[in-house]
Amino acid sequence: MLLEYLQAALRHAHYEILKDDGTYYGEIPECRGVYANAATLEACREELREVLEEWVLFRVHQNLTLPVIDSIELTIKEVA
């Protein structure tokens, strides 16, 4: 389920080439604060994936909600 969520989120990524320095900028609008900047598109995609993974883990650790993406809802259940 986690892998499916990450893949779905990455499909929502938007990329652009920054005019001032020609680097690539990528973000996932549904995941506030998840963005990356790199010299190549592939490096930007890889960095964005890493940032997304860290963002999800941080939110889970802090018991914060995650946005539903493509009908995928990650919820953490408390175990006794």
Task: Describe the role of every protein-language-model region.
Residues 16-29:
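Short aromatic-glycine-(Arg/Gly/Cys) micro-motifs in beta-strand/loop hairpins
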Residues 1-14, 21, 46-80:
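Short, charged, surface-exposed hinge/linker loops at domain edges
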Residues 11, 24, 34-36:
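Structural detector for hydrophobic anchor residues on beta-strands
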Residues 32-42:
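A short, exposed loop/beta-hairpin motif centered on an aromatic-Gly-Thr core
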Residues 27, 34, 64:
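Gly/Ser/Thr-rich helix-start
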